[in-house]
Amino acid sequence: MNLNLTLIGQAIAFAVFVWFCMKFVWPPVMQALQERQKKIADGLDAASRATRDLELAQEQAAEQLKESKEQAAQIIEQAHKRANQMIEEARDNARLEGERMIESARGEIEQETQRAKEELRTQVAALAIQGAERILDSSIDEAKHRELVDKLAAEL
C-alpha cells in the first residue's frame, strides 16, 4: 500500500502543483507572451506605416522636385523671352534714334545749304554791283546799293 498511497500523494501533489501553476503562474506568463506578441505586432505595424510614410514622402519630394524644375524652366524661359524682348526694344530704339539723327543731320544740311545759297546770292549780287560800278565808273549810294542787292537776290 505504500506504493498506492505514495502514488496517490504524488498525484494529489501534482494536481495541486498543476492547479497552482494554472492559477498563479500560467496567467502572468500568458499575459507576458500576449504583451510581447502585441508589441511585436505593433512594431511591425509601425514599421509598415513608416515604410508607407517614407514612400509617400519620397513621392511627394519627387513631385515637388519635378514642380520646382518645371517652375525653374518656366522662369528661365521667361527670362530668355524678356531678354530677347529687351534686345529687340534696344535695337528698335537704336534704329529710331539713328533715323532721328539722320533726319536731324539732313535738316541741318538743308539749313546749311539754304544759308550757303543765300550767302552766295549776296556775294554774287555784291560782285555784280562792284563789276557794274567799275564798268560804269560811277558810285552808287548805299540805299541804292541795298535796293539793287535785294532785287538781284529776289531774282536769283
Swiss-Prot record:
Subcellular locations according to the entry: Cell inner membrane
Membrane topology: Single-pass membrane protein
Gene3D superfamilies on file: 6.10.250.1580
Pfam families found in the cross-reference section: ATP-synt_B (PF00430)
Keyword set, alphabetical order: ATP synthesis, Cell inner membrane, Cell membrane, CF(0), Hydrogen ion transport, Ion transport, Membrane, Transmembrane, Transmembrane helix, Transport
Transmembrane segments: 5-25
Stored NCBIfam families: ATP_synt_b, PRK05759.1-2, PRK05759.1-4
Subunit description: F-type ATPases have 2 components, F(1) - the catalytic core - and F(0) - the membrane proton channel. F(1) has five subunits: alpha(3), beta(3), gamma(1), delta(1), epsilon(1). F(0) has three main subunits: a(1), b(2) and c(10-14). The alpha and beta chains form an alternating ring which encloses part of the gamma chain. F(1) is attached to F(0) by a central stalk formed by the gamma and epsilon chains, while a peripheral stalk is formed by the delta and b chains.
Function: F(1)F(0) ATP synthase produces ATP from ADP in the presence of a proton or sodium gradient. F-type ATPases consist of two structural domains, F(1) containing the extramembraneous catalytic core and F(0) containing the membrane proton channel, linked together by a central stalk and a peripheral stalk. During catalysis, ATP synthesis in the catalytic domain of F(1) is coupled via a rotary mechanism of the central stalk subunits to proton translocation.
Protein name: ATP synthase subunit b
Annotated source species: Chromohalobacter salexigens (strain ATCC BAA-138 / DSM 3043 / CIP 106854 / NCIMB 13768 / 1H11)
